[in-house]
UniProtKB/Swiss-Prot annotation:
The lineage of its organism: Bacteria, Bacillati, Bacillota, Clostridia, Eubacteriales. Belongs to the P-Pant transferase superfamily. AcpS family. This is Holo-[acyl-carrier-protein] synthase. GO terms for cellular component: cytoplasm. It comes from Clostridium perfringens (strain 13 / Type A). Mg(2+) binds at residues 8, 56.
């Protein structure tokens, strides 16, 4: 059963400027494994913006936005085929598990895309729904 959906779109230039103007921008929002991925992609602004939009989309699918946890609690990685995968940690994991009654049925689906100016991400949470947050 679908228990949450979220979408986010961001201007890539805004992310590019945030990286240039705030030396802590990346380390505040992304895990070491995400940063390693960005390095492997030559710190491509489109990739970074896509991951940022993905974190926002997942937080919206959880129904909370970024409340009760940090950006780093939503980790966006890629599998061997390049498909984005979501790993929830700490507060985000607690919220996700609460949605499914701690029955380990939560699955997070994610799609990320971009063009020259914007990055977009769409997330769907699937699992056995157990009620209100």
């Amino acid at each position: 059963m679908i228990i949450g959906i979220g979408v986010d779109i961001i201007e890539i230039e805004r992310v590019r400027q945030a990286i240039q103007n705030n030396k802590n921008f990346l380390s505040k929002l992304f895990t070491e494994r995400e940063l390693d991925y960005f390095i492997s992609r030559n710190m491509n602004s489109e990739v970074i913006a896509g991951n940022f939009a993905a974190k926002e989309a997942v937080s919206k699918a959880l129904g909370t936005g970024i409340r009760g946890f940090s950006f780093k609690d939503i980790e966006i990685l890629r599998n061997e085929l390049g498909k984005p995968e979501v790993i929830l940690h700490n507060g985000a994991n607690l919220i996700g598990n609460k949605l499914v009654g701690n029955n380990n049925s939560l699955r997070v689906h994610l799609s990320i895309s971009h063009n020259n100016s914007s990055a977009i991400a769409y997330s769907v949470l699937e699992g056995e729904y157990y009620g209100n947050m």
